[in-house]
């Protein structure tokens, strides 16, 4: 029994509850991608094949759902970096991850206005945590590619790669910005090769 006044130990969520949560996040990401952050939460629940009560049990507000979609996308990108580091040659892992970063930006650009409208402190913490994950992931993959001798380390800061791709995304108001960002990935990778 925990000492008096200490928080009760948290239990791991049931497998079905976690599965529902992940289905809700994926359904919300897809709904926000097609209809913006104002998409119907009833449609999100329906697409996840759960009731609206289940959605609200996991995410009591629209903002909570938006924040968790954002957090989840950043966490998935971080996890992909580690998986790619273990499964692909360094330069291929870096390129694949940067292309996944473009997909992440697609979600982020949809959520950015809603994130700005959130309580400033919450939004800042969310962005800081996600930024730390992305920095760690980029550093891991760039470090492997440099260590393998496939790319040059001359003045390279892994964040510069993310900034270059993000710059294309932010500057590109055109509907094909993601294709331009994917081309930028190849330009960057080719420019870094030894």
What does each of the following model-derived ranges do?
Residues 61-66, 77:
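Short amphipathic alpha-helical segment with a characteristic S/N-K-E followed by hydrophobic residues
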């Amino acid at each position: 029994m925990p000492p008096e006044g200490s928080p009760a130990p948290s239990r791991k969520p049931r497998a079905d509850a976690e599965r529902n949560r992940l289905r809700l996040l994926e359904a919300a990401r897809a709904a926000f991608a097609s209809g913006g952050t104002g998409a119907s939460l009833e449609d999100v629940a329906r697409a996840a094949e759960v009731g609206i009560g289940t959605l609200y049990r996991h995410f009591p507000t629209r903002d909570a759902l938006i924040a968790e979609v954002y957090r989840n996308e950043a966490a998935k990108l971080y996890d992909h970096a580690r998986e790619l580091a273990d499964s692909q040659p360094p330069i291929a892992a870096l390129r694949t991850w940067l292309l996944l970063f473009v997909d992440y930006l697609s979600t982020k650009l949809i959520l950015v206005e809603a994130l700005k409208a959130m309580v400033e402190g919450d939004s800042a913490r969310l962005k800081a945590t996600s930024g730390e994950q992305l920095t760690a992931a980029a550093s891991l993959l760039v470090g492997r590619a440099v260590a393998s001798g496939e790319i040059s380390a001359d003045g390279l800061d892994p964040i510069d790669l993310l900034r270059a791709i993000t710059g294309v995304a932010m500057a590109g108001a055109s509907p094909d910005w993601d294709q331009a960002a994917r081309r930028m990935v190849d330009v960057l990778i080719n420019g870094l090769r030894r």
